[in-house]
Amino acid sequence: NGAHLRIARLAIDTGYEAPAVYAWSRKVGCAQVAPVKGLEGFNRSSPVSGPTFVDATEGGKRLRRGARLWTVAVSTFKAETYRFLRLERPTAEERDEGAAFPPGTIHLPTWVESEWLKQVVAEQLLTVRTKRGFAKLEWQKLRERNEALDCRVYARAAAWIAGADRWPEEKWRDLEDQL
């Protein structure tokens, strides 16, 4: 409807330039920004864990416990994303009769570009054999560019960190009323 929404929490990947990310997140503040590190695998007790305090450097000087780092089980959120993309959506006729979208539906704008859609489905989950012969699940790229999928995964992690998974119905109604 054109309403402007504020960012509740922003997750930023530390994988490429961790010192710069730590410095920027300290400057902006930990209430708004969550430096994250993605880990593969489904054997995590929680999709997001932390924060843990890590050492950071600023201007060549070591800052002990200078940054808060969140760990994200990216496989969990990728699987959730693909599951939500497969949800059956109600038709326009069904919506006119009061049918709602299922929880988790990913709503895409009509103006979304095909390149973005290709990126959001740029990986597939395969069963591969380890060197010792055991089967394990692994995400493999179908195409080189997958930034849209990564952004969705880290946005979902930011929602988790902000506590959206534990918000009561009343909180969601309050947010909806602000639109």
Question: Locations of the language-model features?
Answer:
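Long, compositionally biased intrinsically disordered regions
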Residues: 103-179
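Mg2+-dependent endonuclease catalytic cores in nucleic-acid-processing enzymes, primarily RNase H-like
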Residues: 1-132
